[in-house]
């Protein structure tokens, strides 16, 4: 049912500090990181770190109603927030997972790549 790993979402208190960590500690060149962009409809600011065969999405809260704030309250240094796999039909995949007992936290929505 699942396809290729598209990206791993990592909630962070500061995208710029996280980028510095990926650059200085892990050796990721600055050219492999995108500029930060705001997604106000989801209450997040995001940037991507491009690594071989995938991406890491850095997610910072945007505004005081950001769902990422709750995550960071429990995990102040940040951490893995989600894993994104590509599927042919998101609704079919969701329904199949629910039928097998999976908990689905919300409806599919347009993400940072502009896709469901």
Predicted features along the sequence, with ranges:
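Core segments of cupin and vicinal oxygen chelate
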Residues: 2, 10-55, 93-102, 107-116
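Vicinal oxygen chelate
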Residues: 5-13, 47-50, 69-94
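Short amphipathic alpha-helical segments, especially helix-boundary/capping motifs
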Residues: 21-23, 67-71
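Short, conserved turn/kink motifs that form compact alpha/beta structural patches or helix kinks used as
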Residues: 61-66
